[in-house]
Amino acid sequence: MKSVNRLGLLSFVMWGLAAPALAQTQANPTGNRPTSYPYVTFGIDSFLQYAAELHEQDGYNAFDLTRGYFKIHAQLTDRVGVRFVPDVRPITDASLDRNLALRLEYASLDVQATERTQVMFGLHETPWLTFEESVNRYRVLGPLFAERLALIPGATDLGASVKVTGERTQVHVGVYNGEGYGRAELDKYKSIDGRATFRPFSDDSELGKVTISGFYQYGWYAKDRPRNVAIVMGSYENERLLGTVQYLSATDNPFVAVDVKRRGLSFFGEGRQGPTGWAGIFGLDVFVPDVSIDNDTRRRYLFGGAHWTEAGTGRFGVVVSLVQEYGSASSQLLSRRLQAQTLIEF
């Protein structure tokens, strides 16, 4: 009963934030936006790749589509919009066949309740992964650290959230089913996700390009089976350099009788000519899947290069990389993969 009351109170608060926006219409359109409502815009994100296994796997190699977004955004008023994004991506079915499947990535109502407050309801972004993608433009390489480890179930989920943006801060908090990517809810348990991001230094200094972010997910697989994840990340970015360092701590219990504590560190760096042109990239992930087991540390290295082109609001990138993964036992090589990937976005 307490859970129902809390959810009811949350719904009431979010409706209160959204109500002023629902009543407001556009008075002075700016920029290139249409002068009347509603209007609809379209866009595409496409990740294509060729990947070759260089260690064991019998030389397996394949061309693949790893993301195919068709982005539809309907703006009903200057403050109320609807986002609908189907996604084509590879899945493995029950017979272990790998096929391309169509599923929904976004289906949400977005309300700009005030100048700095956004309310989102439905299948929409969760606080961490979409934010991390906005910092690191190399999502084309594959899932980011926490998602790759299956600690965060997806970049989108069904739920409701509020995002507040200040001059040097941003806070995003939401309640979600916790299954990820619109999967059906399996039980009564929900996930509460929250992120706070701030720039501790003045914008007019070089240190003003430093950003600190913290994230916490408080969730459950089922009764007495927690899925709690804490992440702290620092990033620095200027025209020619991007660097991120991330620490992850998780208490996880997907299948076993006891909680498993996991730890991880992730580093990523990019040296570049600028927003367009040539770039070199490096990544290192260190992950301890169970801190109770001695000498059980996994390492993942990434080396590569890229070239980026922009045209209007569109972007095209080509990325070539080598990814190697090692186990802790005598630094045993687990996998080595060569990847050539393209990103098309407009």
Predicted features along the sequence, with ranges:
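Cleavable N-terminal export/targeting peptides
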Residues: 1-28
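Short alpha-helical segments used as structural interaction elements across diverse proteins
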Residues: 2-3, 64, 136, 145, ...
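Residue-level detector of intrinsically disordered/flexible regions characterized by low predicted structural confidence
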Residues: 4-8, 69, 73, 302, ...
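N-terminal cationic amphipathic segment used for targeting or macromolecule association
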Residues: 16-21, 25, 144, 269, ...
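Active-site-proximal helix/loop capping residues that flank conserved catalytic or ligand/cofactor
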Residues: 19-21, 119, 160, 194, ...
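Outer membrane beta-barrel
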Residues: 27-180, 186-193, 197-206, 268-281, ...
